[in-house]
Amino acid sequence: MAGRTPLTPVLSRFWDDPKSWTFETYREHDGYRALATALNMTPDEVLQTVKESGLRGRGGAGFGTGMKWGFIPQGGTGPAAKPHYLVINADESEPGTCKDIPLMFMTPHFLVEGAIIAAYAIRASHAFIYVRGEVVPVLRRLRGAVAEAYEAGYVGRDIGGSGFDLDIIVHAGAGAYICGEETALLDSLEGRRGQPRLRPPFPAVSGLYACPTVVNNVESIASVPPILLNGVDWFRSMGSDKSPGFTLYSLSGHVTRPGQYEAPLGITLRELLDYAGGVRAGHQLKFWTPGGSSTPILTAEHLDVPLDYEGVGAAGSMLGTKALQIFDETTCVVRAVGRWTQFYEHESCGKCTPCREGTYWLAQIYDRLETGDGTSADIDKLLDISDTINGKSFCALGDGAASPIISSIKYFRDEYVAHVEQQGCPFDPRDSMLVAPEGAAV
């Protein structure tokens, strides 16, 4: 494709190195130079630099990272007198979302260096990295990287002779998707059942152990060292005015070359598909998710939507985690959304009635539609229950369950009707299966 937006490998630029995860390899690629720059600045100057860069949270909401850091009270009285904590949300668990795990596995020192700089900026002496417990190889890599940083003197007492002390703790979660919600994550870190907290107070004032806390996504923190190293103007030269910089787009599903594609914010799915070899041979795009299973689905008519926070929002969806799940015409949209609904029903923490009861009944209706027992009233009932959940649950899990249902009925209502009229799914699930080519390595 002529004139397509170029890829911008920054966090992924040396993933192909034989030992990309090691301290030595990271140092060969300017590793920990950004930390030296930060330690020659005041914490407030580091915070201001991140603010000016326009870096937005890469975990879904897109809130300004520097602005979030700035909410931490500073001074010697009230909440400001308490210890400050940095918590990194590495509990990546949503269907389709798969950027943080390869980032931590291939280049964990980006995250470690970013955590040190972020902790310095908010004046925290303890940082916690909360990792999904099932990804044991990632846990081992990350703990190894932290140990290397301790050994090199980048973590611990009096880092770089600056008088700054920091301890980093890598904590394994127990597999609950709800712990990806920042306040549920804090409860889990404190040893309690992970459930969302009532806000206010917000974590910036009363977070971990009732102390001022910043909770950031893995990619958000890992993006900080390149900004400190290369400057604000370099970062803002990529992306758009309101959504500057680079990010990882995760392509999966019916695409020729699935994987991570690092590009400026604002690139389009058409361009990314071109880099990825297009939809699998002999098929065409039917629908896709811009930010994982919790975001409203989009269709082929949205191929040229800029993949930044404003562009995707204007199209009626959310950029979210940039998990681009690609589905071709062989896919039953009812089955796909039904599987996501089962996930949200299973992962609901049960704290609030709309989500606990709503996701249960949504899953029952999808089961009826697939087995041929559905009625036309069930389609309207799906919308009715989704409306009851959307915006009325205690946290965003309920919204995530409702969004793909509402959007799928908007774009593919005829498919739902076909399930009722034909008393079951008219699609053969074998057609949409992805089979490894003969001779492929496992």
Model-predicted regions and their roles:
Residues R33-E52, G76, K82-H84, A90, ...:
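Ferredoxin-type iron-sulfur electron-transfer modules in oxidoreductases and energy-metabolism complexes
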Residues T65, S93-G96, E134-L139, A176-C179, ...:
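Flexible loop/turn segments at secondary-structure boundaries
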Residues I267, V279-R280, W288-S294, F343, ...:
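Active/binding-pocket-proximal capping segment
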Residues A36-P79, S237, S250, E262-A263, ...:
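Accessory "access/gating" subregions that flank catalytic or transport cores
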Residues G114-A118, L265-G282:
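Short amphipathic, charge-patterned alpha-helical segments
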Residues F110-G114, T247, A336-R339:
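Well-ordered alpha-helical segments embedded in enzymatic catalytic cores
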Residues M1-R193:
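Iron-sulfur-cluster electron-transfer modules
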Residues L139-L265, G277:
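Hydrophobic alpha-helical positions that pack around
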